[in-house]
UniProtKB/Swiss-Prot annotation:
Record keywords, A-Z: ATP-binding, Cytoplasm, DNA damage, DNA recombination, DNA repair, DNA-binding, Nucleotide-binding, SOS response
BP terms from Gene Ontology: DNA recombination; DNA repair; SOS response
Chain positions recorded as ATP binding sites: 65-72
Main location: cytoplasm
Gene Ontology, cellular component aspect: cytosol
Protein's UniProt name: Protein RecA
A molecular function GO annotation: ATP binding
Taxonomic classification: Bacteria, Pseudomonadati, Pseudomonadota, Gammaproteobacteria, Vibrionales
Role: Can catalyze the hydrolysis of ATP in the presence of single-stranded DNA, the ATP-dependent uptake of single-stranded DNA by duplex DNA, and the ATP-dependent hybridization of homologous single-stranded DNAs. It interacts with LexA causing its activation and leading to its autocatalytic cleavage.
Cited InterPro entries: AAA+_ATPase (IPR003593), DNA_recomb/repair_RecA (IPR013765), DNA_recomb/repair_RecA_CS (IPR020584), P-loop_NTPase (IPR027417), RecA-like_C (IPR049261), RecA-like_N (IPR049428), RecA_ATP-bd (IPR020588), RecA_C_sf (IPR023400)
SMART domains named in the record: AAA
Pfam (any one): RecA
Keyword Ligase in annotation: no
Family: Belongs to the RecA family.
Amino acid sequence: MDENKQKALAAALGQIEKQFGKGSIMRLGDNRAMDVETISTGSLSLDIALGAGGLPMGRIVEIFGPESSGKTTLTLELIAAAQREGKTCAFIDAEHALDPVYAKKLGVNIDELLVSQPDTGEQALEICDALARSGAVDVIVVDSVAALTPKAEIEGEMGDSHMGLQARMLSQAMRKLTGNLKQSNCMCIFINQIRMKIGVMFGNPETTTGGNALKFYASVRLDIRRTGAIKEGEEVVGNETRIKVVKNKIAAPFKEANTQIMYGQGFNREGELIDLGVKHKMVEKSGAWYSYNGDKIGQGKANACKYLKENPEIAKTLDKKLREMLLNPENMQLTGETASAADDVEFGAVPEEF
């Protein structure tokens, strides 16, 4: 760039910063804060699949799946992890179904958790926006998008048609929220439900509620599914769960995490540590015996998990080693083409090799 252009650019940048404040425009290479801060989801497998060690601060996240697949459990695990880091969390319970006893079992400090049970969708989104603008809240969870009922629908008759009303409400909310969340570095998680499209002959008939705006504004979209039951004898004690990252703007998308959600306990962290440790040769498996650093830790996976639960320091060390090994900076490199392609991905339409 010649000298005159450089002077003109410097003057323009100076004028913009004077008018709109420092940091309103910058060179991309100068912004060292571009490294995204994340909060752990509570599942090591999912943190690794996300490629950044957790869900990103200052962004919108969508978690969707069928009923009883673990959507609310995942958000409560994340709230517990955020509270352990001293962060303030809010739960906007549009479904009016939050169980404080279950939340406490998962490690949530219910005395510090902010909870709102709004009457209308507009009220829920206004509360969400006010919390984001305050700059004092770090994580907001909205449960769920399907329960955000527009005021006109609540005040109308049961048979009235309100075509596109919820989608318009959400579209406007996304436009307002995105900038406020970024400025206050607050994460907003929307839990969503699945619906079936009528008359779809080919392709996946599943879709999420609330129109398309949320799909585009979300930096991360997670598809969570129950794949099987975990039994102790005849009693079912948990779910085998698969979580697919169908959109990711902070790392490479389309990765999957397979984990277990135990009833009343949340993620089976010790089981994940054992499985990933064996896979990456940090835990030795000989027959039914598991060993770590040359010491036998249990016969059978259940006993090895029990050992890690009784020795949290060893579990913490193994977790740290696995994160250092698997969360490489290369995983964070994402081309613009990949990010924009991820905007258009419909879950179920992802090639099997991913």
